[in-house]
From Swiss-Prot:
It is found in: Cytoplasm. Its EC number is 4.2.1.19. NCBIfam families: PRK00951.1-6, PRK00951.2-1, PRK00951.2-4. InterPro entries: IGPD_sf (IPR038494), ImidazoleglycerolP_deHydtase (IPR000807), ImidazoleglycerP_deHydtase_CS (IPR020565), Ribosomal_Su5_D2-typ_SF (IPR020568). Keywords: Amino-acid biosynthesis, Cytoplasm, Histidine biosynthesis, Lyase. The gene is hisB. Belongs to the imidazoleglycerol-phosphate dehydratase family. GO terms for molecular function: imidazoleglycerol-phosphate dehydratase activity. SUPFAM superfamilies: Ribosomal protein S5 domain 2-like (SSF54211). One of its GO terms (biological process) is L-histidine biosynthetic process. Pathway: Amino-acid biosynthesis; L-histidine biosynthesis; L-histidine from 5-phospho-alpha-D-ribose 1-diphosphate: step 6/9. Its main location: cytoplasm. This is Imidazoleglycerol-phosphate dehydratase. The keyword Lyase applies.
Length: 208
């Protein structure tokens, strides 16, 4: 595996290339954007979810990924999430002046998802509430429902954030996944926003 290290700037941007025998991934983000996205992962439903993530988090993001999707989408999907987590962590820098916490409850027709984010520096995921069998559904021809948890696991681990994600209602597998991505996006947007009332790092420890 080779990685070109994520490079942060004062503008809260970062870029990273990550290459393994299974995938090649480029991710570039701007936390202070307007939700502009340029996404190509070779997994159309995942492209749709990442585009929604950008739109509702207001993070500008470019993703270019190729991988062994002829075998399974898992490697490419997870490697993109790993790389996104890494650039998110780098773009946040020392986290000075951010709100740190964010929460959102988002519906999509019959589906409803609740997300809470803490940019704590301590990776942790609590993920629940999906209806029985959701993990076995094939969505859009390539994306299995089980990948949703893998995506959030990879992001939280590599970004160093805590995420509680709970599906409160839902029947359609597509809607259940999309509501989660949108809830995460809105919670993340709130958590990484600059708060003019915050001086320094929002932690009694003085570091996150």
């Amino acid at each position: 595996m080779s990685e070109t290290g994520a490079t942060p700037t004062a503008a809260r941007t970062a870029r990273m290339e990550r290459t393994t025998s299974e995938s090649s991934v480029l991710v570039e983000i701007n936390l202070d954007g307007s939700g502009v996205s340029d996404i190509s992962t070779s997994v159309p439903f995942y492209d749709h979810m990442l585009t929604a993530l950008c739109k509702h988090s207001l993070i500008d993001m470019t993703v270019k990924a190729t991988g062994d999707t002829h075998i399974d989408a898992h490697h490419t999907v997870e490697d993109v999430a790993i790389t996104f987590g890494e650039v998110l962590r780098q773009a946040l820098g020392n986290k000075a002046g951010i709100r740190r916490f964010g929460e959102a409850t988002v519906p999509l027709d019959e589906a409803l998802a609740h997300a809470v984010v803490d940019v704590s520096g301590r990776p942790y995921l609590v993920h629940g509430g999906e209806p029985a069998g959701q993990e076995y559904h094939l969505i859009g021809g390539h994306f299995t429902g089980s990948l949703t948890r893998h995506v959030f696991e990879a992001i939280t681990l590599h970004a160093g954030i805590c995420l509680h994600m709970n599906v409160l209602a839902g029947r359609d597998p597509h809607h259940i996944v999309e509501a989660q991505f949108k809830a995460f996006a809105r919670a993340l947007r709130a958590a990484v926003e600059s708060d003019p009332r915050v001086e320094g790092i929002p932690s009694t420890k003085g570091a996150l």
